[in-house]
Amino acid sequence: YYILGDYSGIFSPDTWIKTAIECYYKWEADFIVAETNQGGDLIEKLLRVQDANVPYKGVHAKRGKILRAEPVSSIFEQDKAHMVGYFKELEEQMCSFTPYTVKSPDRLDACVYAISSLQNSGNAIFRIS
């Protein structure tokens, strides 16, 4: 797996969708993945308004962040995942997150969902957005 970019941030829904779509085309991605726990169907509806042709996978978190992150952490430990470039905020979250971390690790969450979504798809390239 290759992490080619980190486009995470605090955006309005419209800006988030536009950024995700731009990344989808820029990196020739297979699909956009988003956690639906907070946005539900709204994310897909906003995406379809902007571009009905972009493939989308919604994921609903059923386990805690630590349990979701453990398999991805193992992939990095086995040297099966690589960052192409330096992603300061993402790397800081990856190195500092504990069960007691107060601030939600948005960038780490995106990375975990990205790699988890690709594990069974056969694709090894993903852009975080």
Q: Where are these predicted regions, by residue range?
A:
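Conserved beta-strand -> loop -> alpha-helix junction used to position metal-binding or nucleic-acid-contacting
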Residues: 53-75
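RNase H-like, metal-dependent nuclease domains and their acidic two-metal-ion catalytic environment used
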Residues: 1-59, 81-129
